[in-house]
A protein has these predicted regions:
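Short N-terminal helix-initiation segments at or just after the protein's N-terminus
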Residues: 77-96, 221-225
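Acidic-basic catalytic patches of nuclease active cores, encompassing PD-(D/E)XK
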Residues: 1-88
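Acidic, metal/cofactor-coordinating or nucleic-acid-engaging core segments within structured domains
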Residues: 123-124, 130-226
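Extracellular structured ligand-interaction cores
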Residues: 100, 111, 141-145
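Conserved catalytic cores of phosphodiester-cleaving nucleases, focusing on short active-site segments
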Residues: 103-105, 110-120
Length: 226
């Protein structure tokens, strides 16, 4: 079923690329998902409990375990679906509007996180020479699918593992873990001193590759896996 979603996006590339805002782009993808999956709304625990026919407490425990797996920074494999009856459903912003993922899709035996990335194109250029999604402080997760669009230009999609290897991700994560510890040591050293400045060390990642002219990425996701 997810294969059909991405096939439709491929067939309607111009339509999806016609979005002028990130919100519009995200809503178009959401509407496409609704054609093939049932969206779970309302109280999450109650809805899942009803679908699974299990008590709320058991549902909460199972979902919290799944959440930890979904948010794991370097989980190399597609996640197994812990729910038996959630086989064609999805959640929108399951962990909040500012948190990964934008969509959590349940497909038979698997659970897939999907994140939407969008870049503005104020000049309305049709053939952009360079275009890169913003990653801020989060590296692409290996088992996630990313849908990236540039306003009025183009759209592509890929898995996190297609653009960053497990080994490279591990090196980056370990490095920034060290920085986090160093920041803690700095704050501890300053806590008893008169100091008008609060140190704020912000990690950020910038992708060096041009996404919309990289044909390998356009064909990198093979939705038949799901």
């Amino acid at each position: 079923m997810l294969e059909k979603v991405f096939q439709e996006i491929t067939n309607k590339r111009k339509f999806f690329a016609s979005s002028s805002t990130g919100e519009q782009f995200e809503n178009q993808f959401r509407n496409e998902l609704k054609k093939h999956f049932s969206e779970i709304n309302g109280d999450l625990t109650e809805e899942l409990s009803h679908i699974e026919e299990k008590p709320n407490k058991e549902i909460k425990t199972t979902f919290n375990q799944l959440k930890k797996q979904v948010l794991e920074k370097n989980h190399p494999h597609t996640l197994k679906n812990p729910f038996s009856n959630l086989t064609s459903h999805f959640l929108y912003q399951p962990f909040g509007s500012q948190n990964y993922p934008d969509f959590l899709v349940f497909i038979f035996d698997y659970v897939v996180g999907i994140e939407i990335k969008f870049s503005k194109n104020d000049k309305g250029e049709k053939n952009l020479q360079t275009s890169r999604p913003m990653w801020n402080s989060n590296l692409p997760k290996p088992n996630a699918i990313y849908v990236y669009g540039v306003a009025n230009a183009n759209i592509t999609f890929f898995k996190g593992s297609d653009i960053l290897s497990y080994e490279t991700r591990e090196v980056l994560l370990k490095y920034f873990d060290i920085l986090d510890k160093d920041e803690g040591s700095l704050k501890n050293a300053l806590k008893d001193l008169e100091n008008p400045f609060a140190p704020y060390i912000r990690k950020a990642y910038e992708h060096k590759r041009n996404f919309l002219t990289t044909t390998r990425l356009k064909a990198s996701f093979r939705p038949t896996t799901f």
